[in-house]
Amino acid sequence: MSKLKLISPAVPNVPWQDKPEGHTGAPVWRYSENPIIGRNPVEGVARIFNSAVMPYGDEFIGVFRGEQVNGIPYIYLGRSKDAIHWDFDKNKIQFVDEEGKPFMPIYAYDPRLVKVEDTYYIIWCQDFYGAAIGIAKTTDFKTFVRIENPFLPFNRNAVLFPRKVHGNFMMLSRPSDSGHTPFGDIFVSESPDMVYWGKHRHVMGKSSEWWESLKIGGGAAPIETSEGWLLFYHGVSGTCNGYVYSIGGAILDIDNPSIVKYRCENFLLTPEEWYEERGFVPNVCFPCATIHDSESGKIAIYYGAADSYVGLAFTTIDEVVDYIKEHSVVTTSDTEEGR
């Protein structure tokens, strides 16, 4: 039983593998059978990566970034009995507008999947006169209705909170430019209806730590805990041979997520294995989802690896929160409301 409380439903069949003997460093360890999704997983799809999964009934469901053989990314639906071995629909998700008419994005990538009350929301990056945030909703994973674009371009890495805060939906995002953005901070915005968004607040920016000195962006949906919102995010460093994407951790205030309570100065996971270092885009660990069990405190982290694979890692709520707090370094802009 965890000493900290995960405020979420129990998921007794959360995928899990015990920490390897002799493991050192941050308390996040890889699944020994990684990657869980390899190349050419579906006819016409070269790679699946940067994808989001969650419990659905007694099994699991997910939305997956499928890079087609023509290079265009779309979102595919997948199902699994154990959240490790996945079966994918052969065709990409067919979106409609609120009148039921076909309404497909030009492209769609890096989806997140979050349930708020009785509705599942898919959030992704799309083309809206440049890179922008797209949102769709479903209640049955059969009909996917696109709703209004929340923000102007350019924006990426949007992540919806799993419940309303003070009666409003809350969403993290990372304003950007139209290309491979060499900058970026995390902001939070709120909405009464998932249409009109405002009260934009700065959450946190890049830091002086080398692993996240270029830019940062939201990752998996924040996890509600008795200590605050646990956020796994990505941090990027620039090297003479390109960018390196690592996974970081922070804890946001439960009532005002623009305030950072703790922020780990060390990365939690950085590219080290072949499937993280070698691929279409080398040196990438990009978190997009977690599955967590409130009874045991177990957390499974799903991340894109080298823009080519899906990796799985594990931690526990007690270990990761203790580590973040023990190695926390926050700035004035982190701890103040960013307005």
Protein language model annotation of sequence segments:
Residues 1-106, 114-214, 223-283, 294-298, ...:
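Beta-rich carbohydrate-recognition and catalytic domains
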Residues 220:
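Catalytic core of Fe(II)/2-oxoglutarate
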Residues 288, 292:
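C-terminal substrate/ligand-recognition segments
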